[in-house]
UniProtKB/Swiss-Prot annotation:
The chain crosses the membrane at residues 447-463. The keyword Transmembrane applies. Belongs to the paxM FAD-dependent monooxygenase family. It is found in: Membrane. Glycans are attached at residue 128. One of its GO terms (molecular function) is FAD binding. InterPro entries: FAD-bd, FAD/NAD-bd_sf, FAD_mOase_fung. The lineage of its organism: Eukaryota, Fungi, Dikarya, Ascomycota, Pezizomycotina. This is FAD-dependent monooxygenase dpchE. It is a single-pass membrane protein. FAD-dependent monooxygenase; part of the gene cluster that mediates the biosynthesis of the diterpenoid pyrones higginsianins A and B. The first step of the pathway is the synthesis of the alpha-pyrone moiety by the polyketide synthase dpchA via condensation of one acetyl-CoA starter unit with 3 malonyl-CoA units and 2 methylations. The alpha-pyrone is then combined with geranylgeranyl pyrophosphate (GGPP) formed by the GGPP synthase dpchD through the action of the prenyltransferase dpchC to yield a linear alpha-pyrone diterpenoid. The keyword Flavoprotein applies.
Amino acid sequence: MSEPHFKVIIVGGSITGLTLAHSLHKIGVDFTILEKRATVTPQEGASVGILPNGARVLDQLGLYGLVEEATAPLGATHIHFPDGFHFCSLYPKSMLDNFGYPVAFLERRRLLEVLYNALPDKSKVLVNKTVSDIEQCEDGKSAGVKVRTADGDVYEGDIVVGADGVHSRTRSELWRMSSSAGQSEDVRMEKARMSAEYSCVFGISRGPSGLKAGEQIMRMYDGRTLVVIPSKDDVVFWFLSRKLGKKYKYSEAPRFTLEDAAAECAELADAPLGNDVRFGDVWKIRQTFNMVVLEENLLRTWSFGRVLCIGDSIHKMTVNLGQGANCAIEDVAILTNLLSQCLGSKREAKPSGQELDALLRRFNDVHLSRVSHIYDTSWLIARVHARDGFVRKIIGRYVMPYFGHKFESRPFNMIANAAALEFLPLPRSSFPGWEKYKSKEDKSGSWAVVSRSVLLLVGLAILSTWWRRA
């Protein structure tokens, strides 16, 4: 009697979870998605940015065409400072020219619709399924995982992948099992890494705004950043991030109401956006909005036995760099590649629990260095945009406008070195950036080099002033 098919239980019908489902289908792996909400396409007022590294994987899966149709590609970013200075960056156009994919923003709900509607078998997506606990077993033929839901149902598979976001239930179960195995101190350290220093009001407005589609506006204030992204069909995406009064532990992070969000936006109602348009005008045509705390975490251990977490559950970033969803899509690519290699070599029998534990640890080892680089860059960019500290103000005001093009290769390295699905053709690979910037990624923290350079320049300027006065 032949072995039953290998099966993955995916917790979370998120962008990450649905993309994983498509990838698993491509290699013939069965799956079930357990989503706690009543729908996989909720309206939460959020947009999502798809950059070339995420776009390429979606393109490999045959999904990017619908994403592209829903967006107006960014061609420029207009950046404004408190002293009235502003400049225009053509970085978004340069990214398109180099990689063949634009910086594209669309409604998060629309992307979820694209991913869900394209699934070959939607019966594998189950809603109103809140995970209560996960059990692992290595007892002969019954080896595998059991996932219990709050309604009493049990779902069996070979591995569990938590794609259930920053408030991950899967992560909690992973930590519970790790603690039971004598790793309580490691779990304590992981929990301590989770914090929040920023809040964000994000929203979607609809109607004539007077703003040009594809031209992003960013206004940088001390402790705040306002970003407005006019898109096609008179849709405007926007977000307002703000540094909180202190750094919060994840478990103590504040919650916000819609009244809090409205008050936050009212403070910047007079912020000019160009063409005699102010942020208050965009606010007046709002369709939906929300306010959340922006958690930040980069965990070091992503798996235990047959249980793995991916996406925001292990690497949550601020919104400024726009790599959150794209990094999660890369998680999917690397995991699917490893599963494809492992299952292809097994032929008749399934991998043992020991082999799967090693595979998931391998995923962690392979990907952690790159994710760390992206996370560190995102961490710094958020603080440069918020003018948080003297050196970061100097970087934003004087380095970015005049020397930003010199550092353009840094984010391009990040794109070119991205993971893709190894078993599918690479679309748009003829664009020069994929080869030009590949394998030149500076994982030592290129922006740290910029910071040190700025400090040196400031120090020399102070010494020069002192010398002239002496």
